Every structure is written in structure tokens, then in C-alpha cells.
């Protein structure tokens, strides 16, 4: 249909059958629709739920805003005495009069009658192809939706887009495009106005005044943290300031109720001023809520409601806090409210000194005990005042802590020896040195570069039984490395640094012109030699030269470890002049010192 012919028919109030949207049409694209409840104010969003549109064209002039150019209507009546007041109204009133729609001005929204369902049938005309019947509600408010449309030419209402192409060519309904232009993210609902006619079904977008249950950016939770409340935050939760200036919330009395009246004591653990009334809307004086005996105060309430949608802001992005009045008694300062708030209302006790939190004392791990380096048992005793700790004793534990690396290593040695005795206390380990050479073995002074020298071709068997392996020692290897090699079964260079700094204190010095046994010690770490070496006759033979012409065979009668003051171990070897060289039998059931004295006397 040409737009000029459409404009002429529109002025005459002709109904168009190709318009599939049941609406009340103003020229220039203004649509009226039914609204349940009071009409919205100008400037707010006028879209509401349960819309009831009427399929009828109310024709008027294209210049509807100008009351000077108002032509006569053919099918409808506009009984308006004051056209200026008509144009300034925010809604129109529709009633059913003789199968025609009559538009009249409404007074107040409160004067609306109840809903009465009715039916309107459109009589056939030259341009109407079929009979269309639909239901509507009489005596309802039909408000103008606030749809911002650009002004179009008078002869082309709602048919041309910005490019000049008709909306019908694009497959769009021009009246349906009005609702598509409305900005709303709410789900749409469909309402049918006829049971048999499917054409009368229109999808209308619904406004939700509450937060949606579906996903939205506003209700998205990115992070949840759980912290301990600080003292100021606890005081903020528990305190409340009355209109007369009193601050209530601190528990200052340890008592609960009075033994005679059985009422809560003021400022106690059951105080009504702090936690709330015992009975609903009744103070401690026994007075019930009355407008004459209360104090009011406006405080922030936790209820949050969304602000209505507006065209300038995005929907559901602003929140408004409702202000609620709270009423208090003038005499006893008890709030007039429900007694159930005693379950949630907080109070606080002001402590003279800070105390520990049970999570950090009894928790696993106990962070305070780790920080103070105390046992949890002693920490709980101090926390619950069953034990005392003075400053003098508190710093005593610090003196026992190792400071230097050597002391740390020594303490570690002791701990590992107790924890793993089978690893650090070797058993059935024997050292046997054989040699056929008669080169002398000398003990040098501690200040010399070479500590010990020994005869070549010395073999040290390692292990037991068939697993014994012999290690040939080089001539340049010092004797202390031999001892370490035999004890630890490791290369001497790897662990040499462990005992090097203490080695000079353990050298044995032989007195001149003395026939007593020599005590030769080596700085050896970790491993203890067994004491069964002498009992099993596993002897270590050394050849020592003297001023005589023949060598004297000496034996190591006893080998043992002695713990020094600094935590290191000494390998003490008692070198005894053997009586075997003179043909005498060596006693076997005596300890090392007895043998030493006996052999010394024999010599």
C-alpha cells in the first residue's frame, strides 16, 4: 500500500487488516496499552507486566499535539471539553459504549472500577477482510509508553526507516518495531487476546523489579575471603547509638538475671537494651508500643532494592538503601521490635589486655607456638593462666639455640645419632692392616705439613665374608685418612674437611725415653668402631723402630670413640709393646688399660 493512501485511510480512522499488532494507535507512532495499577509518572519507565492491548485504530489528525487542528472523527468520539487538559493528561480512559470505543479523560487513578471482561467485535468494512473479535477489560487505564522515536514526515508514519526503505519490505511489523526498540533485558512473556485467533498473540517484554535468578554481572562473586574481625569491627557491629545520645552494646556486668524478679540485669549478659526485648514490641518497663512513648531514629537497613529502570542508566546497576525507623522507649531505652532479634544481636566485652585466638593456639599447626618456639602444652598453660613466664626465662631458650654453623652441625649430629642409631652406629666393622715391610712408622709434630706416614702396600679389607674388598692405600695418603677410610668406607678427600680443623688437637706425643703406651687419636666423624676388636683377636699391627737393631711389634689393644666437648668423636688407639716379640702370651681377658700396665711392667 502506498504511504499516501495509508495516510488518508489513517485520517479517516480505517482499520488495516495487515497490521497484526492489536494496538490503539495515535498518529506519529504513539501507542496506548493497558496497564494494571496506577499509571507511572513521566520520566520513569512505563512498561509493566500483564499488558492488555486492544486491536482498534483510534484515528485523529497527524498533528495530534496541536489541539487547533483537530478534525471530526468518523468512528470514534472524543468528548473532551478542555483539549489542552486532554493533551496534558498522562492516561486516557476507555469504556465500552455501543460496540464503540470512547476515549475520555480520567480523574485520579484511585477512582478506577473493578475489571469487567467484555468483548468488542469489529464490523466489516471495505478494507476489513475478516471479522476479528478479542477480549479486553473495561474501565482500565491505557497509558502512553515512553518510546523515543524521531519525528517522521506526516505522510509516512512508521513505514519508512532511516534509509527510506519500508519496514514491511524488510519483513518487520512497523508496530512490533516499537516494542523492539525498547531497552530491556528482562525475559518476554506472551499474552493472547483471543482463543482461536493466533494473530492476536503479541510478545511483550516484562520488567522484573527484583534481581534475576539467572547469571548477571551484578550478582557475580569473584572472591570470598574469611578474616578475623578486628576490635573496631566488633564494636561497630555491637554498638548502637540511641536518639538521646546514649551508646549501648557493651556488657559491663557479668550477672544474668535478678534472683527475685527473674528479669535481665541492666548491662548484663541478658540485657534487653543490648540484645533486644523479651516480648515482641514491649520494653523493659512493661509498656507496649505506642506512638506517644517512643523515640525515633532513622538508621540504615540492610534491605537492598533495585532502582527503577531509566533511559539514562543501565538496568539493575544501581542500588538504593531503604531507611527504616527504629523506636526506643524513653525510660528504659529498650527498642520496640521483635524478640527474635536476640538471636542475632551482638554485644561485646571490653578486655583489659588483648588475648589470643583459639584458632592460632589450638589449631594444627599452632602458629603462635611455632613463632615463639614453645610447646603447645606450655603455650596453652600461659594462655589459660595456669603457668607463668617471666622475661628472664623467656630469653633463656635463645641461649640454647645454635648460633654458629659448627654448633648447628653438632646439634644435628646428636639428633641424627638418636634418631637413626643403626645408620650412624656401625657394628661388626673391622680394620686389619697387614704388612711385610719393616719401614718405620713415625708420629710427627702437629705443626708439620705431613701428619703421619706409613708403610706402603697396606690393604684395608671392607665388608664381611665373601663381600670383603681390599683397598690398596697409596704412600702419600696420611694415616688419619686411613682411619677414616676404614671406618666410613668412603674416599678420604670427600670428608676430610669435617675434621681437618680439629685434627691438630688430637695428635699424640710420645714422651722421650718412655716405654709407656702411646695414645694416638684421630678426628673421625659419625661412626663408632666396635669394642669387640680386641676380644676377637682382630689386631692391627704396626712396626715401630727404636734405637735397637731389631723392630718391635706393637698392637692396637683397644679402639673406641670418646665424645669430645664439641660433639666430635675421638678414635683412641692404645699402642702397646707386645710380648709376642719376646715369646710371651698376651692376656685376652683384660681391658686395654690393664693390658697396658701389665705389658709395660713386662717390658
Swiss-Prot record:
Keywords: Chloroplast, DNA-directed RNA polymerase, Metal-binding, Nucleotidyltransferase, Plastid, Transcription, Transferase, Zinc. In plastids the minimal PEP RNA polymerase catalytic core is composed of four subunits: alpha, beta, beta', and beta''. When a (nuclear-encoded) sigma factor is associated with the core the holoenzyme is formed, which can initiate transcription. The keyword Ribonucleoprotein does not apply. Its cofactor is Zn(2+). DNA-dependent RNA polymerase catalyzes the transcription of DNA into RNA using the four ribonucleoside triphosphates as substrates. Its EC number is 2.7.7.6. This is DNA-directed RNA polymerase subunit beta' N-terminal section. In C.reinhardtii the gene for this protein is split in two. It comes from Chlamydomonas reinhardtii (Chlamydomonas smithii). Its main location: plastid. It comes from the Eukaryota. Binds 1 Zn(2+) ion per subunit. The keyword Transcription applies. It holds the Pfam family RNA_pol_Rpb1_1. Disulfide bonds: none annotated. Zn(2+) binds at residues 283, 285, 329, 332. One of its GO terms (molecular function) is metal ion binding. It catalyses: RNA(n) + a ribonucleoside 5'-triphosphate = RNA(n+1) + diphosphate. GO terms for biological process: DNA-templated transcription. It is an enzyme of class 2 (transferase). It is found in: Plastid, Chloroplast. GO terms for cellular component: chloroplast; DNA-directed RNA polymerase complex; mitochondrion.
